[in-house]
């Protein structure tokens, strides 16, 4: 209940959680707030310098995580990866000023096995980092957005969801009733823009867009793509929905999940 602020020193995370065990942030009374500032090279929530940030679960509350120089907002510190991060509720902001992902890897770190199933999430990558995924030169993979309202913005040259500068993005799934907004990072110097979903930019080349798996995206879910530097409250450049329509059943209840056999095609056996 109430509000708590954690502010760390050099090479340490605001709320430090390195490789061992797990960390759960919960708010049963729905009125708690946590702000965590990482010191230089430390994540807001996750790893200190040279450390990974893994097995982090946020189920509720107002959480604001600000990574220090070269570290993620939520995830790895400098040279650390962010993995097994799950957000299922709450209002979560995750930002970094330079070279780290909003949620995922610190500078030179990857972001993987990241799941968002609910809540309001705003992830902003630092310069050359992804909003959700890899930090500077890091890849972003196995990222699932299955619910909630999610906004992911890459820093300069970073993908909205996927890789940081020079990093790849792959294994990205958007499903359920997810409301997702993505924006790749802008050109910086001779380095190209980041993809909305996909890879980060590289020298003279824009990041490659990757088509996410939307087979299990419900008719109420959508992905909105915004241009670099554009306002994410305006009209998107592109909106993606699942071409599958609503299902009408004559009787009974579907108890076995569908198998996705193609874009917009679900098979029940």
Task: Give, region by region, the residue ranges found by the protein language model.
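A composition-driven surface/loop motif
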Residues: 1-248
């Amino acid at each position: 209940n109430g509000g708590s602020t954690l502010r760390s020193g050099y090479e340490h995370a605001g709320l430090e959680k390195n490789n061992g065990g797990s960390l759960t942030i919960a708010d049963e009374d729905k009125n708690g707030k946590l702000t965590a500032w990482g010191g230089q090279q430390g994540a807001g929530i996750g790893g200190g310098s040279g450390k990974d940030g893994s097995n982090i679960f946020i189920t509720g509350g107002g959480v604001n995580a600000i990574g220090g120089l070269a570290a993620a907002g939520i995830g790895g510190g400098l040279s650390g990866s962010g993995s097994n991060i799950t957000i299922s509720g709450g209002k979560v902001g995750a930002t970094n000023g330079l070279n780290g992902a909003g949620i995922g890897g610190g500078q030179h770190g990857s972001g993987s096995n990241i799941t968002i199933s609910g809540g309001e999430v705003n992830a902003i990558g630092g310069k050359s980092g992804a909003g959700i995924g890899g930090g500077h030169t890091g890849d972003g993979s196995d990222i699932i957005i299955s619910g909630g309202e999610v906004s992911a913005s890459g820093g300069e040259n970073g993908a909205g969801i996927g890789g940081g500068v020079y990093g790849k993005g792959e294994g990205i799934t958007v499903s359920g009733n997810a409301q997702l907004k993505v924006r790749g990072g802008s050109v910086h110097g001779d380095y190209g823009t980041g993809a909305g979903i996909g890879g980060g930019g590289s020298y003279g080349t824009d990041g490659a867009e990757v088509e996410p798996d939307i087979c299990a995206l419900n008719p109420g879910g959508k992905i909105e793509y915004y241009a670099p530097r554009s306002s994410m409250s305006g009209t998107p450049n592109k909106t993606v929905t699942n071409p599958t329509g609503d299902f009408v059943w004559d009787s009974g209840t579907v108890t076995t999940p569908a198998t996705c056999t193609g874009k917009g095609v679900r098979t029940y056996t």
